[in-house]
């Protein structure tokens, strides 16, 4: 019986960290890989690559824990989130806090193997991960903070490889923020009605009937900024083809969200994994 209870607890931690739902980690991973490949260029040091890949999964898990901790009193009122480990009682608040600390410490131990500049930048990464979940109570733009949190691995990657933060770094960082606002607005469109009832703020609520138009403008801006990154770094035709494919994927997402149906909005959000993958493949092939 004790083993069974222990197994149930581990499964609850597994759900709390969303290790069963890798989409968030992948949306964090792709910009990290973009930055490592551009900063290297094309040949990131193996240890630095390993540190960042592991760090992505650890910090995404930590972000999920603190997000659910911040939303623990709201999630029980939303059908999609009512069975999450904290509102359901499968994980206690103390256990969630402990798990968050363990995940952050493991991430920091990895960062300590990198240079001083990257270690200092990691402090901002922790601050963004902690602050983001609470922003949806105070501002309709929490997705901007999410974009900064998901994109902070970009300056960290440039710092770890070259100890510099060139213009390409900041253009890519801005592109990632705009991309995150676009895809997380699609995600927020799924819960918009519930969020209005319980007082949670989001860009989906802020944009209202202009949501599809603004998402489209953001997507065009992402492509333009990533095109500028390619131009600054002399990337080849492979990369520009990947931008063309990404534009097609964005077009497909616009079709999915056209009627604002919950399931299709979620499919549009999930489709962004392919955008990140396609851009990475274009970058990688351009450096071959």
From Swiss-Prot:
Record PROSITE patterns: UBIA
Pfam families: UbiA
UniProt catalytic activity: all-trans-octaprenyl diphosphate + 4-hydroxybenzoate = 4-hydroxy-3-(all-trans-octaprenyl)benzoate + diphosphate
EC number: 2.5.1.39
GO annotation, biological process: ubiquinone biosynthetic process
Keyword hit for Transmembrane: yes
Topological relation to the membrane, as annotated: Multi-pass membrane protein
Pathway: Cofactor biosynthesis; ubiquinone biosynthesis
Stretch forming the signal peptide: none
Any one cellular-component term (Gene Ontology): plasma membrane
Main localization, broad class: membrane
UniProt function note: Catalyzes the prenylation of para-hydroxybenzoate (PHB) with an all-trans polyprenyl group. Mediates the second step in the final reaction sequence of ubiquinone-8 (UQ-8) biosynthesis, which is the condensation of the polyisoprenoid side chain with PHB, generating the first membrane-bound Q intermediate 3-octaprenyl-4-hydroxybenzoate.
Protein name listed in UniProt: 4-hydroxybenzoate octaprenyltransferase
Organism: Klebsiella pneumoniae (strain 342)
High-level lineage: Bacteria, Pseudomonadati, Pseudomonadota, Gammaproteobacteria, Enterobacterales
Gene name for this UniProt entry: ubiA
